[in-house]
Curated annotation (Swiss-Prot):
The keyword Lyase belongs to this UniProt entry's keyword annotation: no
Transmembrane segments: 17-37, 54-74, 85-105, 144-164, 174-194, 204-224, 246-266, 284-304, 327-347, 381-401, 407-427, 438-458, 467-487
Catalytic activity: L-proline(in) + Na(+)(in) = L-proline(out) + Na(+)(out)
Keyword annotations from UniProtKB, A to Z: Amino-acid transport, Cell membrane, Ion transport, Membrane, Sodium, Sodium transport, Symport, Transmembrane, Transmembrane helix, Transport
InterPro entries reported for this sequence: Na/Glc_symporter_sf, Na/Pro_symporter, Na/solute_symporter, Sodium:Solute_Symporter
Name of this protein: Sodium/proline symporter 1
Taxonomic source organism: Staphylococcus saprophyticus subsp. saprophyticus (strain ATCC 15305 / DSM 20229 / NCIMB 8711 / NCTC 7292 / S-41)
Gene behind this protein: putP1
Length: 514
């Protein structure tokens, strides 16, 4: 157990018991992947969307685990450790955003995607919803998914490399490659079902870890007095409104806007067996999320006192969870906690790889081969989907080979890109009959471009004026929303009867019919 005043480095060397736990964890993932392979290799819909036959509990934890990547276990505790309780605005904004997403987006998207040509990707839904015979919206939205998800997956690869480097002293690149090989294996073979089932398993592992570490840390320190000691070190540590600026609080809170446009999360709503099961999924999923995020904040707060009393500096705050887990627990339990970090990392990577693979297959390859070929040669399209998983993973590894940013920063950029490009479009496509194809394309592009410009040219001016530190999703989301509405007002609407479709969708959601 932990003894105050001793060296961190003398207590964090993993032994064979830690390795055994990790090997067992990897084997479980591969077994689940094999099960998914045996169950869902028949056609593209099954491989990409589980045949729309996923239950509420798997849907909930799959959405949660694919959302709460390595940033929750490594990034958020590190941010709380650095800035104090004010970083909890991020957790508050995300929880509120996820809850609204379940209420506003999930029911209509589940019904409308099936009604609109049984769309299995977001670009496919946009195309059918807007009657886009030119396929321009499908190509552009598909390209945005491929670009931003490749960058998003890159953040997961970085997390995996950092974990193995900090926990085992393993070379960063070897650790990253090990994570990539395992994720590729079960995603390649098992498809959506394997990804969802492994996400469920990994979600259970994650919540146990996030509850366990801060509680044990408190017991090892001074119980609830730990927080008093944390405040004594710096009064702003326990002040929700200090330790950051007003712009910082707004930016943290604005992360919740991103949920409306995250393809790897909202695809979970499309795959649930029935719209009637969504309330169960919502209660279970939001409960899991709130407890996990509370635990992450707890790790950061207890870590402030924990590291201070150990008399040791921490070089990278994002390794706080790793250090606390290895010092506080028996190596076997420490291995379990490392598995929890891997669970967070790999659950997100696998979901992102599958969504990107789906987009490459459905939104690009199908356009080249044609609809008839897709129906006649489904195994060919499944194979293309699997090969796409490998290609995207390789590109992400290449980008992540030389990490030069924080995990939270990498995730934040990709999150903003998707939230701004797709968030307003998803909401308007589900609720507004006046949406046009030209408006949708203009809004998507403007949102993505504003995010990129803000990151590249505006944020570097943050030292001049704090306003420029505003999270890029806010200007990107607002720009996309305004441009979409304004352009739609002056351009041609779809030829199909959208008002009748929206009325039918409302009816189906209300009655719960499949």
């Amino acid at each position: 157990m932990f003894t105050l005043g001793t060296s961190l480095s003398s207590q964090v060397d993993p032994n064979w018991q830690t390795y055994i736990m990790l090997v067992v964890y990897f084997v479980v993932l591969l077994v689940i992947g094999y099960y998914g392979f045996k169950q869902s290799t028949g056609n593209v819909s099954e491989y990409m969307l589980g045949g729309r036959n996923i239950g509420p509990y798997v849907t909930a934890l799959s959405a949660g685990a694919s959302d709460m990547s390595g940033w929750m276990i490594m990034g958020l505790p590190g941010e709380v450790y650095t800035t104090g309780l004010s970083a909890a605005w991020l957790a508050i904004g995300l929880t509120l955003g996820a809850y609204i997403n379940y209420i506003v987006v999930a029911p209509r998207l589940r019904v409308y995607t099936e009604k609109a040509g049984d769309a299995i990707t977001l670009p496919d839904f946009f195309k059918n919803r807007l009657d886009d015979k030119s396929n321009s919206i499908k190509i552009i939205s598909g390209a945005i998914i491929v670009v931003f998800f490749t960058l998003y997956t890159h953040s997961g690869m970085v997390s995996g490399g950092v974990l193995f480097e900090s926990a085992f002293g393993v070379n960063y690149h070897i650790g990253m490659l090990l994570v990539a090989v395992i994720v590729i294996a079960y995603t390649f073979f098992g498809g959506y079902l394997a990804v969802s089932l492994t996400d469920f398993f990994q979600g259970v592992v994650m919540i146990i870890a996030m509850v366990m570490v801060p509680i044990v840390a408190m017991l090892q320190l001074s119980g609830l007095d730990t927080f008093t000691q944390t405040a004594e070190l710096k009064p702003t540590n326990l002040d929700l409104f200090k330790g950051t600026t007003v712009i910082g609080i707004i930016s943290f809170f604005a992360w919740g806007l991103g949920y409306f446009g995250q393809p790897h999360i909202i695809v979970r709503f499309m795959s649930i067996k029935s719209v009637k099961q969504l309330p169960t999924a919502r209660r279970f999923g939001i409960g899991w999320m709130a407890i996990s995020l509370l635990g992450a904040v707890g790790v950061g707060l207890t870590g402030i006192t924990f590291i201070n009393q150990s008399g040791t500096d921490i070089e990278n705050p994002e390794t706080l969870f790793v250090l606390m887990g290895q010092i506080l627990f028996h190596p076997l339990v420490g291995g379990f906690l490392l598995a929890a970090i891997l669970a967070a990392i790999m659950s997100t990577i696998s979901s992102q790889l599958l969504v990107t693979s789906s987009s490459l297959t459905e939104d690009f390859y199908k356009l080249i081969r044609g609809e008839e070929a897709a129906k006649e040669h489904e195994k060919e399209f499944v194979l293309v989907g699997r090969l796409s998983v490998i290609i995207v993973a390789i590109v992400s590894i290449w980008i992540a080979w030389s990490p030069n940013d924080t995990i939270l920063g990498l995730v934040g950029n990709a999150w903003a890109g998707f939230g701004a490009a797709f968030g307003p479009l998803v909401l308007l496509s589900l609720y507004w009959k006046g949406l046009s194809r030209t408006g949708a394309v203009s809004g998507m592009l403007s949102g993505a471009i504003v995010v990129i410009i803000w990151i590249a040219f505006v944020k570097p001016l943050g030292d001049v004026n704090d306003f420029f530190n505003l999270y890029e999703i806010i200007p990107g989301f607002l720009t996309s929303l305004i441009v979409t509405v304004v352009v739609s007002k002056f351009t041609k609407k779809p030829q199909i009867d959208v008002e009748a479709d929206l009325t039918d969708v409302r009816r189906l959601v209300k009655t719960g019919e499949d």
